[in-house]
């Protein structure tokens, strides 16, 4: 059972990270009902240009304030834009510049929500923080474990894998025991302003604009050739950073002589030559990997890898658990899968599980092909 469901001492002060969404709104309400001293905090992590219509921060703040007014709690505001730029966004740009595909949400959780926000809340006198993430915390053997959320469609442990046990010990996850429809029902029952608000999608600082339009504001495009597996040049790309492994849309390839009607997919990036390598078919052999190498591993709690471990892993959000064997090598960590994995993407995260416990994860450095002969 999660500590978030236990009765709370009335003297425990909790500050809830209020995003202006339904999950954090209901989190604050549930904690209030459980007897905690509850306050909210809205964090601004991105400084948009004057007049922009992309960022929803103003609307989100208004929604968070409306919810806090409704349930009768104070709302603090904090600006972590400088920390976000230094610790999340610059890394995001560097990864794209290097031809990789990063996941800024994971860094944002580690550096902002469970570091900058946690530190700020403690400075305000909080005993604990809370968020609206769909995960659970279990305290066992003197340490706090990260468990999957009970709603398999909303479990967010993949995004929180880099948060340490010490930070988890100071955090409550009130909706981790619930399914999304239950959360919305609670919000509607209490007439919260966010009850029917759509879930946010995409990267927070990009909003609704096209990703390529956003990226070229910060990084110069480097056009190059698109090649088939046999080396034939069949097109041009605007920049490797705009493409990811397994991508189908936006390649601009079609009507080639002697080619089948099957769609084209990004198979690989040749960073040395600035070449995008593509092939036809959703199950093209080049799309599959039997193993991967990972670095920058963060464990929620220490893990003994003196011998290989049989675990499960996800190489992308909402993927089903994939059986693998993990071992530590001189180059980092190597995960070998029982079933070849499609579109293993350098820069993305691989996250490891032991049953419902999220152990941690790292950044995918390299995918190993599942057959001989691939470049």
Swiss-Prot record:
What residues does ATP bind to?
A: 17-24, 43, 132
Which residue pairs form cystines in this protein? 108-204
Q: Which reaction does it catalyse?
A: S-sulfanyl-L-cysteinyl-[protein] + uridine(34) in tRNA + AH2 + ATP = 2-thiouridine(34) in tRNA + L-cysteinyl-[protein] + A + AMP + diphosphate + H(+)
> GO annotations under biological process?
tRNA wobble position uridine thiolation
- Which InterPro entries does its entry note? MnmA-like, MnmA-like_C, MnmA-like_central, MnmA-like_central_sf, Rossmann-like_a/b/a_fold
Stored Pfam families: tRNA_Me_trans, tRNA_Me_trans_C, tRNA_Me_trans_M
Q: Segment Interaction with target base in tRNA: which positions?
A: 103-105
What are the recorded GO MF terms, alphabetically?
ATP binding; tRNA binding; tRNA-uridine 2-sulfurtransferase activity
* Entry's EC annotation: 2.8.1.13
Q: Where is this site: Interaction with tRNA?
A: 133, 348
SUPFAM superfamilies tied to this protein: Adenine nucleotide alpha hydrolases-like (SSF52402)
Where is it predominantly found? cytoplasm
Q: Does the keyword Chloroplast apply?
A: no
The annotated region (Interaction with tRNA) lies at 154-156, 316-317
Q: Does the keyword RNA-binding apply?
A: yes
- Catalytic positions are 108, 204
Identify the enzyme class. Answer: transferase
Q: Where in the cell is it found?
A: Cytoplasm
Which keywords belong to this entry? Answer: ATP-binding, Cytoplasm, Disulfide bond, Nucleotide-binding, RNA-binding, Transferase, tRNA processing, tRNA-binding
Query: Taxonomically, which superkingdom?
Result: Bacteria
Protein family membership: Belongs to the MnmA/TRMU family.
HAMAP family (UniProt xref): tRNA_thiouridyl_MnmA (MF_00144)
Function field: Catalyzes the 2-thiolation of uridine at the wobble position (U34) of tRNA, leading to the formation of s(2)U34.
Record's protein name: tRNA-specific 2-thiouridylase MnmA
Q: What is the lineage of its organism?
A: Bacteria, Pseudomonadati, Pseudomonadota, Gammaproteobacteria, Pseudomonadales
